[in-house]
Amino acid sequence: MGKYGEIQSGFMEERTRILDALDLPENKHITLRLIGALAFRTHCPKYGYFQDALGRVFTDIDFAGYSKQYKDIVRLLTELGYEEDKMVTRLFGDFRLVLHEDKFGRHIDVFLDKLDFCHVLPLKGRLEVDKPTIPLAELVIEKMQIVQINEKDIIDTIMVFREHRVGDTDKEFINGKLISKLTSDDWGLWRTLTGNLTLVESYLTKYPQLTDEDRRVVTENINELRTWIDAAPKSLKWKSRAVIGEKKKWYKDVEALEDRT
């Protein structure tokens, strides 16, 4: 048995083991926040069952952290029974770590300082805002910035919009003020995010497991976020890029290694 007990077979149980280790005095200085499906489940205790009801399965455990704590992050996850993928570190170590465990064949992704997928989402100064996940605004953007979005991402987004209202704060709210600030300076992010909000809304009638009240609340919150986004003054950079529109590619393609969240 390792320092923090045995690796657990269930994703939720393994998540808890890692979070418990982070709460110990020797690790409290490490800023490591859940992202991905497990983060949505953690932040949606009331409606987390949506993932099960709609067929959403867990495939890995993902975190966000700070590059300045790279050594401490690797040390902790190694003590938890994971082994650093040195090749990934050599290729992407300034913003990405991958660690593996052999018992159940799982891996942990750790994204450092930013989420860099179809669009870049900076995280510096934001990881301290919430715990044990990244803030709700970043959870929404994490999914809504994916150009080739999957159904699993749509399910996660429906769930978070059912559980949490949109407002101008981070505490148990989806921070529409912050999201609108980011989309008002980046036309590409605005284009992808607003398009995906419409797609999420269109999926609400697909799932008979959802009640009319579920659909009403999710639609209401999507519309509230749209109101924030539409009302935010757009930067000169945004306006200049909007003139070009979709004639020029507005997003980055995501490599297979990065498409795991």
Q: For each predicted feature, which ranges?
A:
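Active-site nucleotide-donor binding segment shared across nucleotidyl transfer reactions
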Residues: 19-74, 134-135, 243-246, 250-261
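N-terminal regions immediately upstream of nucleotidyltransferase
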Residues: 1-22
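Short, flexible active-site-adjacent loop segments at beta-strand->alpha-helix junctions, enriched
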Residues: 38, 69, 103-105, 114-116, ...
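Short, solvent-exposed polar/charged micro-motifs at secondary-structure junctions
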Residues: 43-45, 96-100, 120, 181-183
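Generic beta-strand structural signal
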Residues: 61, 95-97, 106-109, 130-132, ...
